[in-house]
């Protein structure tokens, strides 16, 4: 492994908020990159302040590092001041945990929470020295993956991403690790085409290069799989029981002030409301609640580990959680499951579901 830290450190006294690029936060992991393990770089394509609190990245970070056949690190887009210095000195995009060059990972996975980060993805790839267009990548280049809500319309990024994860990622990353690991151990038999074909067989994974598109002028006439075993329609991946995935177990505590600077506990996923303006409420169905006792435990243990004095009970409509009253009162009233005097944040709270008890 090539450590970039000796080349990065001299640049940090010339940039704003150098702690963005140090790593080693409470909750961070320093994985061992064994030759037989699949190395993942999980990238939130925005600055550290915006990306670090992202629950999706933290969940996959823990899940992958619990596996014997995987090693996962984090990456965040550098601010323009450091980017200019990196380009001037030929310092590539790097991971935060060990400052390993991004191009040395087996997989670079981007979390696309919204369409406005698309250009940041391309910039990170360019900084990494990885060909921006998928068709130009060689066998030794990382597999470029994207997941998150924005991937439900993957086509704007289809020329740049090798594989999209549609839906929940908790199970998919394990399936992908097994496929990529088997390909590595085989000596990369069949080249990049072979591993992308095998990835396309995983439920919830869309590989654009496995499909041929026929046009009628500017309109699409037909989309055909290139192989008979590749699915014609990619179904989203959904975890059935949120209680089986009590993550993140060890939330990261940032080195500088970040957005959503508090403990975050997801109490349910999905939504029953069906608001027509809300993409997330449609694509994350069905509703899956976290068991009340598990939510209590995650709040109590999370507050003790992080030292936060505020917890956000996150969901698309937190007041619709069936045990919301008991959960909030347990935190505020200092019952056995609570952790003293802490504030409770209820994001996405609907007025028609707000009660005096919650207040």
For each of these PLM feature ranges, what is it?
Residues 43-45, 75, 111, 147, ...:
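Short hydrophobic segments within beta-strands
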Residues 1-18, 67:
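Helix-enriched interaction subdomains in cytosolic or periplasmic regions
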């Amino acid at each position: 492994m090539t450590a970039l830290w000796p080349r990065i450190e001299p640049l940090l006294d010339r940039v704003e908020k150098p702690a963005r690029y140090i790593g080693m936060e409470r909750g961070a992991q320093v994985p061992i990159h064994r030759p037989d393990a699949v190395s993942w770089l999980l990238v939130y394509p925005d600055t550290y302040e915006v990306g670090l609190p992202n629950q999706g990245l933290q969940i996959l970070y823990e899940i992958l590092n619990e596996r014997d056949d995987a090693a996962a690190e984090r990456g965040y887009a550098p601010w323009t001041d450091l980017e200019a210095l990196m380009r001037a000195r030929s310092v590539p995009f790097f991971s935060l945990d060990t400052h390993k060059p991004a191009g040395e990972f087996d997989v670079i996975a981007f979390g696309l929470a919204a369409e406005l980060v698309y250009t940041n993805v391309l910039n990170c790839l360019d900084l990494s020295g990885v060909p921006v267009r998928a068709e130009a990548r060689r066998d030794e280049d990382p597999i470029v993956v994207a997941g998150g809500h924005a991937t439900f319309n993957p086509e704007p990024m289809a020329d740049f991403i090798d594989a999209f994860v549609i839906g929940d990622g908790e199970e998919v990353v394990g399936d992908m690790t097994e496929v990529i690991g088997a390909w590595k151990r085989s000596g990369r038999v069949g080249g990049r085409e072979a591993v992308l074909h095998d990835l396309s067989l995983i439920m919830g994974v869309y590989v654009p290069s496995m499909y041929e598109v026929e046009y009628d002028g500017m309109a699409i006439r037909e989309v055909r799989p290139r192989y008979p075993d590749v699915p014609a329609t990619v179904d989203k991946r959904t975890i059935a029981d949120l209680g089986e995935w009590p993550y993140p177990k060890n939330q990261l505590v940032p080195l500088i002030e970040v957005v959503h600077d508090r403990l975050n506990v997801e109490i349910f996923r999905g939504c029953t409301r069906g608001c027509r303006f809300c993409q997330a409420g449609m694509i994350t169905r069905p509703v899956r609640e976290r068991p009340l006792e598990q939510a209590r435990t995650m709040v109590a243990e999370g507050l003790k580990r992080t030292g936060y004095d505020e917890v956000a009970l996150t969901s698309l409509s937190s007041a619709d959680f069936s045990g919301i009253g008991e959960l909030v009162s347990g935190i505020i009233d200092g019952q056995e499951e609570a952790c003293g005097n802490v504030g409770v944040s209820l994001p996405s709270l609907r007025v028609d579901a707000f009660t005096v008890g919650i207040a």
